[in-house]
Amino acid sequence: MPEQQYDTFSKFGKSFQEKLVKTILFDRNFANQMEEVLDTSYLELKYLQVFVDLLFQHKQSYPHPTYEAMVSVVRTQTEDYSDSIIKQVIEFMARIKSNAI
């Protein structure tokens, strides 16, 4: 029986995936479209999945978050995730802020 394959963005690499998530954060219209079609499991990296899940959850109750709002979300709503994942999310956000992505 052939192994079932799942589609992911892994073939596009880490840089592409991080830029995609950065665009979701900063472009509200794009984020609205992606929210309708993006299954976060397509993202290969767990910290990107967590970040996008947190962003989309925030959008359910509040307007599209700013970078600063996401800093607050990450500080207050990540208790269900491991310390290593939270650290990676924080490092990702630091790279966004420093324009390293």
Descriptions of predicted regions:
Residues 1-101:
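Noncatalytic partner-interaction/assembly domains of nucleic-acid and motor enzyme complexes
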